[in-house]
C-alpha cells in the first residue's frame, strides 16, 4: 500500500478528567456501556452516585483509548488532557458553594472556559509533549491508576 508522510509532529489531543481516578474498582464496566444506561437508579438525575459513575467511566475510557492509539500508531503523538475543574452549569452546587469542597475537588480554583482551554492549547503547540502522556493543567504529568497499565481494557475497548 501507499505510505503517507504525516509530518514530524502530528498530534491528537483527547479530553479527559482527573475524575477518572474515581472509576469503579473493576475499571471500565463494559456490560454497563450502552447508549441508555438502563441499570442506573432514578437518583442519577439528581446527581446520585450512578451519575458520577457514568461520568467517570468515559473519562477512564478516553485514557485507555489514548494508550491504545499510541500502541497502534506510534508515528503520531497522542496525549490526554484534563482542563481543570471549570465553572460551568455542569459543576455541582456543592463544589461551587462550599469552600471545603472546592479545596478538595478544585484545589487550583474553578477555571473559566478560557482557562479550561489552556492545557489543551499547551498540548497542541507546546514543546516536550510526550506521546501517551496524561497532563493536568498546565503541562503537569498526571497520576495514572493501575487500571491504565492493564492492556486487557485497551483491547476490549478497541474491539
Q: What is each PLM-predicted segment?
A:
Residues 36-41, 103-107, 157-159:
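Glycine-rich loops and low-complexity Gly/Arg-rich segments
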Residues 62-65, 116-120, 157:
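Alpha-helical packing segments of well-folded alpha/beta enzyme cores
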Residues 43-50, 85-87, 91-112:
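Alpha-helical membrane-targeting segments
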Residues 1-89:
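Rossmann-fold NAD(P)H-dependent dehydrogenase/reductase core
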Residues 77, 98-99, 131:
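Secondary-structure boundary/capping signal
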Residues 104-145, 153:
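C-terminal helical subdomain
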Residues 148-159:
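Intracellular terminal tails of multi-pass secondary transporters
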Residues 27-30, 93-97, 150:
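Short, glycine/charged-enriched secondary-structure capping and boundary segments
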Amino acid at each position: 500500500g501507499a505510505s503517507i508522510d504525516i509530518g514530524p509532529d502530528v498530534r491528537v489531543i483527547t479530553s479527559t478528567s482527573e475524575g477518572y481516578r474515581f472509576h469503579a474498582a473493576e475499571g471500565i464496566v463494559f456490560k454497563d456501556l450502552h447508549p441508555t444506561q438502563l441499570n442506573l437508579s432514578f437518583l442519577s438525575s439528581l446527581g446520585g452516585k450512578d451519575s458520577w459513575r457514568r461520568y467517570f467511566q468515559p473519562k477512564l475510557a478516553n485514557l485507555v483509548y489514548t494508550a491504545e492509539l499510541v500502541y497502534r500508531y506510534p508515528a503520531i503523538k497522542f496525549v490526554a488532557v484534563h482542563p481543570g475543574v471549570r465553572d460551568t452549569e455542569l459543576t455541582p452546587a456543592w463544589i461551587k458553594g462550599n469552600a471545603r469542597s472546592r479545596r478538595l475537588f478544585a484545589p487550583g480554583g474553578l477555571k473559566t472556559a478560557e482557562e479550561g482551554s489552556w492545557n489543551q492549547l499547551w498540548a497542541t503547540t507546546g514543546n516536550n509533549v510526550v506521546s501517551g502522556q496524561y497532563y493536568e493543567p498546565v503541562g503537569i504529568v498526571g497520576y495514572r491508576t493501575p487500571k491504565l497499565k492493564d492492556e486487557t481494557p485497551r483491547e476490549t475497548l478497541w474491539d
